[in-house]
Amino acid sequence: MRVFGIICEYNPFHRGHKWQIDELRRLAGEEECAVVCAMSGDFFHRGDFAIERAHARAEAAVRGGADLVLELPLPWAISSAEGFARGGVSILAATGVVDTLAFGSECGNAAKLQRAAKALLRADFPDALREELAKGLSFAAARESAARALIGEDAAVLREPNDILGVEYCKALLQSGSTIAPLAILRKVVGHNGGAAKGFASASHIRELLTNGEDASAYLTAESAAIYARECAAGRAPVTMQNAERAVLSRLRAMCEEDFARYDSGNEGLYRRFYDAARTAASVDELLSAVKTKRYAYARLRRMLLAAYLDVTAADVPPEVPYLRVLACNERGRKLLKTIKKTGSAPVLTKSADVRALSEEAQKLFALTARAADQYVLAYPELRAARGSSAWTEGPVIV
C-alpha cells in the first residue's frame, strides 16, 4: 500500500485541502493508498492561535479524506519554515510507513526544489548569506540573492511561500537521510495570501471571513463547515489572539529583558525591542509595529511573541519528535496505527496513560503542549467552554 504524508495546519480545513487529498488518490490509481497528516495543534506557524481547536480540525481532515492525523507538537508548530518542516518530516519518518511527502507548490517541480535545498545546505552558503544580509536586505531577499549566486534562476523558487516550504521539506529529508520521496503538486487555486477564485479561497481569507462572522461555507467542505458551526455553537470558535490579548500583554509586561533574550533564537537583539515595546504597547498590533524593522517579517515577530507568551525556548526542541500523538483517524488509519506501533521509531499516544511510559524528555514536551492548550482555551469566545486539562482528557476522534 502506498502511504502519502502531508505536513499541514488545516486552519481551517477547506476545499483546496480536500482537492489535494483527492489528487493523491487519483495519482495512486488502482493501487491502495493511505494519507497520513502531521498537523499543527492549537497554535500555528504564523505565530497565532488556530481558529478552532486541533481535534476539530483533525476531524474535519479525516472526514475530508485523510486517514490518520498526528499532532505536530508546539515547538515545531510555531517555529520558522525550517523548524516546521523538520518537525513534520520527523513525524512522518517516525511512522515507518510513509513513502511519499506530498505538498502544494507554485512551481510543481520537486527536482527544482531539491536543487535549491542542496544549495542552502552547501558549506559556503552561510557566508554568502551573511554578505547579502550585510547589504541591508531582508532575510528572504538575502537568501534568494545568495542562492542565485550558486544555482542561478532556480533560486526563484525561494520567492513563493509554498515553494519555500517545499524547499525546507526537501532540506529536512536530505538532512535526515530519509527515504521518503518529495512530491510537489502544482497549485491550481489561489495563492497563500490570496482571496477567492473558482470556489476556492486561501486559508487566510477564510479565517478573515470567519473571524468577521461572515459565511465561508462556499470555501469549506460540508463536513468542515458543520464542524465549525458546532464549535461556534459550543462557544469554542472562532479563536483569535485578540481574545487573549490582555493575558498576552500581561505576561510580556511582567518579563525582564533577560527573559525576552531566552526567546530570541537568532540572538539578533530583537529581545531588546520587544522588552521596550512591551512596556508601553496597549495592543498586540501596536507592540509588533513598534518592534518591526525592514529585516524581519511580521510572522517572525509573531512567532517570537507567541514563544514568549507560552514559554517555548530552543531548549524545548529535541532533535526529533519523541512521540506520535493521534488526533483523529478512520478505520484505515486505525489499521495503519497497528503497523506503526510495530515498525515505527516513536511511541504512539492515544490516551493520557501512554504519557507515563515516555522518556523524561518526551514527558516534558507533552506537558509543555498541555500547558499551552490550557492557555488556548482561555481565548475561546465564551469562557464557559474554557475548561482546562484538555490535552490530558481528550482522546482521538474516531470517524
Residue ranges and their predicted role:
Residues E59-P73:
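A glycine-rich helix N-cap at a beta->alpha junction
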Residues R25-G29, V62, L92-A93, L174:
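N-terminal cationic-hydrophobic initiation segments that often serve targeting/anchoring roles
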Residues M1-R57:
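N-terminal catalytic cores of NTP/NDP-binding nucleotidyl/phosphoryl-transfer enzymes
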Residues E32-C33, D67, S178-I180:
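A structural micro-motif
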Residues E31, G65, G96-V97:
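Short loop/turn motifs at secondary-structure junctions
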Residues L72-V399:
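Active-site cores that bind ATP or allylic diphosphates and position pyrophosphate for catalysis
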